[in-house]
Structures are given as C-alpha cells and as structure tokens.
UniProtKB/Swiss-Prot annotation:
UniProt main location, coarse: cytoplasm
Organism of this sequence: Rattus norvegicus
Disulfide bonds: none
Tissue expression as described in the entry: Liver, heart, skeletal muscle, etc.
Residues with PTM N6-(pyridoxal phosphate)lysine: 314
Highest taxon above the source species: Eukaryota
Protein name: Alanine aminotransferase 1
Subunit structure and binding partners: Homodimer.
Name of the gene: Gpt
C-alpha cells in the first residue's frame, strides 16, 4: 500500500494527475470477491488455448474445459423446438415459412403479442412479461401436484444468479454484530460467497457430510447457527438441491427437517433448484421446497418465508447464454415485495429472448402437438446420456487408487476427494498455493484438462477435492477420466 501511495506522490511531483480509482480507493468489498469457477485455473486454460493456436508444442492437442456447467459449449445440441420458436420470435417474417411446425408458430405469435411493439427487441415490464409469468405459475402448479402458484409472486430474471443476488440484497443489513449472517452449504457454489463478500454480509458455513453422500445434517446446521450468533445476526438459510458441486439430491424427509429448523430459528429460506430436471440415481427424486412447505400445512405453509429459483441454463436445456431464470417468493411481506419490484426495476428488465426461452421450458409441446414427439425424444436423450455419464464418472474415479467419488445423484458435476502426498502439499505451500490448486494446475499443464480445485468451493480442513463437469461427449469423457486417473497416479508417485 505504501508503495502505491509513494507512486501517486511521485506522479504529483512530476505534474501528472494520479488515478481517481485505485486499488486503495475502490470498493473494498469488490476486492474480496472471488469466483473460483472462472478463476486463475481458467485464465491459464485460456492462455494455453492461445498458445496451441500459435503452434506452441504441448503434451496435449486441446484444452478440455471441464470446469463449468456449460452444456452447449461441450457439444450438447440445442432442443429443436426451443430454437424454432426463438428464430420465429427474432425474425417474424419466418412465420409464413412452411419449414416451421404450426405449434412453434402459435407459440411465437403468443410471445410476440405480449411484447411491446410485437418485438423481442422491446423492453418488458421489470418483473417480466405477464403471460410468461402466468405460464411459469402453471408449470409450478403442474410440477407440485396442483398446489397453486400466483404469477404476481414470480419475477423473471437474468438467469437464476441475478435473482439470487437480488434476494440477498433485500436480506442483508446491519453493521458489526448486527450484520446479516447467511448460512450456505460447504462445499458451495461460489456465487454465494462472492455475493456475500460484495454485499459485506457474514458467510456462515455449514458442512455437508461427505461420509453420507453429502447429506445435509440438522445438527450441523444448529452448530453453525449457534456459533454464528456470537458474531452476526443469522437471517438466511441457503440450500442447493440438487447440489452444486456435490451432486446430492435431498430427500423429502430432509427438506421437511430443514423447513422446521428454519421456522423455529426464524430464518428466511432460499432454495436454489436450478438442477431440478437433473436427477439420475435410482431411488432419488426431486422435491421442491415449495411443494413440501405447502404440504406440511400451517404454521409452516402460512408463515415460513421462501424464495426458490430456476433457470434455463441447466436441466436438459443447457441454454446458458440466453440468461433466463425466475424466482418465486412465498409468504413474503407485501411491502418488502414492492421493494423487490423496485429493486428489479433499476435494471429495467431481464433479457427478453431469455424470457421467451423460459416460456418454452415451462410450457413445452404437449402430446397433441406436432413437435411433441421430437421434443420428448431429444429431452430424454440428453437426460439419459447425463445419467450414463454420472454413473461412468463415479465408477472410474472409485477404481482409481487415491480418488474417492460419492454417487452423482443429480446436477452436472462430480466432486471427488483426492489423496495428495505430503511432499506435494509442502511444495504447494512453498508456492503459496492451496494443495488442490497446485494439483489442478499441474493437471492442466500436463494434460490440458481444466477442473476447479475444491478449495474454491470450500471443504473440510485436511481434505482435497476438485469439481469436474460430466458434460463432455461420452468418448471424450472416457478419455478425460482415464487421463485424469493416470495423472493422479503419476503425480502421487512423483511426490512420494
């Protein structure tokens, strides 16, 4: 810091104007933000790709991006019906073309009728296009066995991430020991730790139980809450189901216990359910927090506050780039809900193409429509392939000495634990790196495989992990798993 001040003083003496915005004058909360999924490992992967394009010789011919859940970047084909409707919405002159099915045309016409100037390029209202919010409400009702959903409690968003951050902005307040504490699962999706750092909230970690397939334990929630009350005011409990990066699917009994705990302790519940279509393990089933809450009856159904989130980026869709999502709020204070609408209006509106895509996700072709057969086949193919990849990943890792992988019950990732030799840990410390960061960097440099170290998600002290997506095409995934297992054996031998 002193050197930067001296540099500015020297600039002043030389007649040069110093920068107004520096690392010292910028928002300190932003400096604390970290996002491992796009952190140093990924930056190095980009450099390696550039070097390969320039003809630099490497021990590999391509960088395999297994660091992020971007399905289409990994080769997954878009759902035909979704793209047909989007094409019609973007260029309505195609509505007269015989190359598009009639149900796609009807869907596009309905969306365009709800847009300002009948154009996807117009702003929508801040909470999202009304007929699309109505379709989201009907989807939630179907998903939850007829439990009513009110479109006025649904806000469309720029992906689920935007809605999550907006909700946290509403919830975070106070200073000192009165600062809002937010309970998040460890391992966690780094969006949460990054958002809490930016908002200057207190992150309260509760650990998932790796020995029980990343189970959520109420006793652990209670421990985290009690310890946090000495330093903050815990007000929020976040649950990711299915889990990211851990891939577990919560049982109904667990969800009921979490709701009872939140109600008893006066916590606002945030349920991140963007992987609700991604459930693979036999015996596992997705249960929405909204459905369980309502079926529990009063006082839970009438008093427990809940926000649940969904997205077009995951599931079988994989439409990450369109940035479509929604949040449904339950039992929210009416005046606070108005403030939420105000906060969203500052950003004008979510991307309208993303809203249109969300409409197709929640209102896909029905059995009586011409596009249904192809849509259903494409959807089932994607989910069946993901299930096979999840099983393969678990099997290969568990056959490799020094690697242990829990069942990938859902979502799009495996989060295996790796044993690292003491000499490797010591070498990492000499370099100022977390041991699993050192392992992942070495893996990238030697094999071109880009994964994210577990330290970026949080983990029990003394354990090491990495997160790897299961999205690559099957043959590439087999090769990736084989190369990774061989590298770990070589790495272990080298540092033993």
């Amino acid at each position: 810091m002193a050197s930067r001040v001296n540099d500015q003083s020297q600039a002043s003496r030389n007649g040069l104007k110093g920068k107004v915005l520096t690392l010292d004058t910028m928002n300190p909360c932003v400096r604390r933000v970290e996002y491992a999924v796009r952190g140093p490992i990924v930056q190095r992967a980009l450099e390696l790709e550039q070097e390969l394009r320039q003809g630099v010789k490497k021990p590999f011919t391509e960088v395999i991006r297994a660091n992020i859940g971007d399905a289409q970047a990994m080769g997954q084909r878009p759902i035909t019906f979704f793209r047909q409707v989007l094409a019609l919405c973007v260029y309505p002159n195609l509505l007269s073309s015989p190359d598009f099915p009639e149900d796609a045309k009807r869907r596009a016409e309905r969306i365009l009728q709800a847009c300002g100037g009948h154009s996807l390029g117009a702003y929508s209202i801040s909470s999202g296009i009304q007929p699309i919010r109505e379709d989201v409400a009907q989807y939630i009702e179907r998903r939850d066995g007829g439990i009513p959903a009110d479109p006025n409690n649904i806000f469309l968003s720029t992906g689920a991430s935007d809605a999550i951050v907006t909700m946290l902005k509403l919830l975070v307040s106070g200073e000192g020991r009165a600062r809002t504490g937010v309970l998040i699962p460890i391992p966690q999706y780094p969006l949460y730790s990054a958002a809490l750092a930016e908002l200057d909230a207190v992150q309260v970690d509760y650990y998932l139980d790796e020995e029980r397939a990343w189970a959520l334990d109420i006793a652990e929630l209670r421990r985290a809450l009690c310890q946090a009350r000495d330093r903050c005011c815990p007000r929020v409990l976040c649950v990711i189901n299915p889990g990211n990066p851990t891939g577990q699917v919560q049982t109904r009994e667990c969800i009921e216990a979490v709701i009872r705990f939140a109600f008893k302790e006066g916590l606002f519940l945030m349920a991140d359910e963007v992987y609700q279509d991604n459930v693979y393990a036999e015996g596992s089933q997705f249960h929405s927090f909204k459905k369980v809450l309502m079926e529990m009856g009063p006082p839970y159904s009438t008093q427990q506050e809940l926000a649940s989130f969904h997205s077009v980026s995951k599931g079988y869709m994989g439409e990450c780039g369109f940035r479509g999502g929604y949040v449904e709020v339950v039992n929210m204070d009416a005046e606070v809900q108005k403030q939420m609408g105000k906060l969203m209006s500052v950003r004008l509106c979510p991307p309208v193409p993303g809203q249109a895509l969300m409409d197709m996700v929640v209102s896909p072709p029905t059995p009586s429509e011409p596009s249904f057969k192809q849509f259903q086949a494409e959807r089932q193919e994607v989910l069946a392939e993901l299930a096979a990849k999840a099983k393969l990943t678990e099997q290969v890792f568990n056959e490799a000495p020094g690697i242990r992988c829990n069942p990938v019950q859902g979502a799009m990732y495996s989060f295996p634990q790796v044993q690292l030799p003491l000499k490797a840990v010591q070498r990492a410390q000499e370099l100022g790196l977390a041991p699993d960061m050192f392992f992942c960097l070495c893996l990238l440099e030697e094999t071109g495989i880009c994964v994210v170290p577990g330290s970026g998600f949080g983990q029990q002290e003394g354990t090491y992990h990495f997160r790897m997506t299961i999205l690559p095409p099957m043959e590439k995934l087999r090769l990736l798993l084989e190369k990774l297992s061989h590298f770990h054996a070589k790495f272990t031998h080298e540092y033993s």
